[in-house]
Regions:
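Class I SAM-dependent methyltransferase SAM/SAH-binding core
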Residues: 40-98
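A short acidic, Gly/Pro-enriched loop at the edge of an enzyme's catalytic core
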Residues: 100-109
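Acceptor-substrate binding/catalytic loop of class I
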Residues: 146-156, 189-205
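A short glycine-rich, Lys/Arg-flanked "PGG" loop and its adjoining helix->strand segment in the class I
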Residues: 123-138
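Conserved class I S-adenosyl-L-methionine
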Residues: 138-182
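Short alpha-helix
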Residues: 186, 197-221
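Conserved alpha-helix/loop element of class I SAM-dependent methyltransferases that forms part
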Residues: 7-40
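Core SAM-dependent methyltransferase catalytic element
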Residues: 213-215, 233-255
Length: 255
């Protein structure tokens, strides 16, 4: 359903990549450049339209592979790579059931920017993504901070959503529509759109799930930058005092 947004943005995404501009944010770039200083095979889990995947080539990746559950998204990603004459592998796969052919293949497994909220079992997620990391390789997560789910996005002053259970809420949010900050605000819902299910995972839950796979936590940092316009009505002077994203880097021990 949301692939239409990526199709409409295809020309702009290709032009940006062609100009050598990575679709990555400041909190990510320094870490990624360091981790990929000697190159490496990179897997991007839940790659959507592939712009971020191909951007990883601009910060040092030797090869990139993207997985997504949507064949339409992968078709958009493949078109971008073809236009740019870039070699990339695209794999149709559910993150909760990544194929064994991806296991232990990658120096870096990259994910985030609205990926974990679609996972209904954080431990199964961790088991799958960590299985794809080579010994001595890294898992890299750049994700929205779970605290952002607490704030009322319709308010003009910082306040907790009145109908939300708080930071530790484990309820699943379900809707047939997409956020207007994710797709065009004027894109009308289509009859028959599937119901989407999201839930938030606390920092503690994410870090624990990764650590329980035997990964060694190297970096956990929090940042004021948004990767999407989550609170358009709230003043930036106030919101910049809070974390809106985080970076988690974990290393798989040598065998």
């Amino acid at each position: 359903e949301a692939s239409g947004q990526y199709t409409r943005e295809l020309d702009a995404a290709v032009a940006k990549l062609e100009a050598g501009i990575a679709n990555l944010m400041e909190p990510e770039i320094g870490h990624l450049t360091r981790l990929l200083s000697s190159g490496g095979d990179v897997l991007h889990v839940q790659c959507a339209g592939g712009t971020d995947t191909l951007s990883l080539l601009l910060v040092g990746a030797s090869t990139v592979t993207g997985t997504d559950i949507s064949p339409n998204m992968l078709a958009v990603a493949e078109e971008k790579a073809a236009r740019l004459n870039l070699d990339a592998e695209w794999v149709l796969a559910d993150t909760a059931r990544l194929p064994e052919t991806l296991h232990n293949r990658f120096e870096l497994v990259y994910t985030g920017r609205g990926a974990l909220n679609w996972m209904m079992d954080i431990n199964i997620w961790a088991q799958n993504v960590c299985a794809c990391v080579r010994p001595c390789g890294h898992l890299f997560i750049f994700e929205g901070h779970p605290l952002d789910w607490v704030w009322d996005e319709t308010a003009r002053a910082l306040q907790i959503q009145p109908d939300y259970g708080g930071y530790f809420d484990t309820n699943v949010a379900s809707d047939t529509e997409w956020p207007t900050s994710y797709i065009d605000a004027d894109m009308e819902p289509v009859a028959g759109w599937s119901k989407k299910h999201e839930r938030q995972w606390t920092l503690g839950e994410v870090v624990t799930a990764v650590a329980q796979q035997g990964m060694i936590i190297e970096v956990l940092s929090e940042h004021p930058e948004y990767y999407w316009d989550a609170h358009p009505l709230l003043p930036w002077d106030e919101m910049k005092k809070l974390p809106h994203t985080y970076v988690l880097i974990a290393r798989k021990p040598a065998e």
